[in-house]
Amino acid sequence: MDSAPVLVTGATGKQGGATARALLAADIAVRALVRDPDTDRAKAIAALGVELVTGDLHDRDSVIRAAAGARAVFSVQMPGFTSDGDFDFDGEVAQGVNLIEGARAAGVPQFVHTSVTGAGQHLEHPRWSEGWAVGRSLGAKTAIQDHLRTAGFAHWTLLKPGFFMENFLPSMAFLFPRGLAGGLVSVLKPTTRLSLVAVPDIGAAAASAIADPARFDGVELELASEYLSMTQIAEVLSRVLGTPLTAPNLTEEAALAAGMPQMGATHEWMNVAGMPGRPEFARDLGIPLTGFEDWAREHLG
């Protein structure tokens, strides 16, 4: 077995953390790129046996140093904020490109990047030209994907996870902004079907790709753990919680008034375009998946 480590970005967050844990469970060494090794989150992953290296995705030289000797890189970026409080999607692209180019300069043979469902395909939709709130986000994700495809790695894989099951946690104040008693709040329509994904399944998919680079070479996996409508989701949550819930059927204005975060408006695109991820895509590759009801019973029951 290759004893070289995998450089994991975002290891103190959700997707990177899930990937680090999945790799460790497979006896694959993990090196995490962190900006500050003295934070509680960094210390927590170090306690699992993760090697910490200090760097910044805006500093390509630090990326090259961090990637030296790695067998693979796991890549995830989220936009920061500009000085006026807007999402910094240009910065997200810059980080992704720096990581790709830094890994190439360091001679890393494999690159596994997690993006988002439907990124790139959105440009082909007949209604895309109407303008949608999710436009800049999908544009940033697509730009990083395009750069990876032509970067020249010996092996590369794109993971395109769907709608996080974790968005249903009341602590997120996202789909339950008023708590469970306040019901589901969203612009998603009752018949809209979501390609749901549990965050640990993203880690499992990344670890599977890293363990078998040749099999996953060039794979662009639309990753879903389950594919359910909002009505079906409400039925599952009702069973688990023992509280009757109905799928919302709200306008954007009504949803915002009920507490939906502004970024929830981006979900209007899902009502129009749907989500391409299906569980069978991952199952065909041997990736273990988490059913939504099982997830809900573990986290909400």
At which residue positions do the language-model features occur?
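Oxidoreductase cofactor-interface core, primarily capturing Rossmann-like NAD(P)-dependent enzymes
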Residues: D2-A44, H58-D61, R65-A72, M78-V93, ...
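A hydrophobic C-terminal alpha-helical subdomain
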Residues: A22, F216-D217, V240-L241, E252-G301
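Short, conserved active-site loop motifs that form the nucleotide-linked donor/cofactor pocket
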Residues: G49-V50, W156
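Cofactor-binding loops of NAD(P)H-dependent oxidoreductases
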Residues: G55
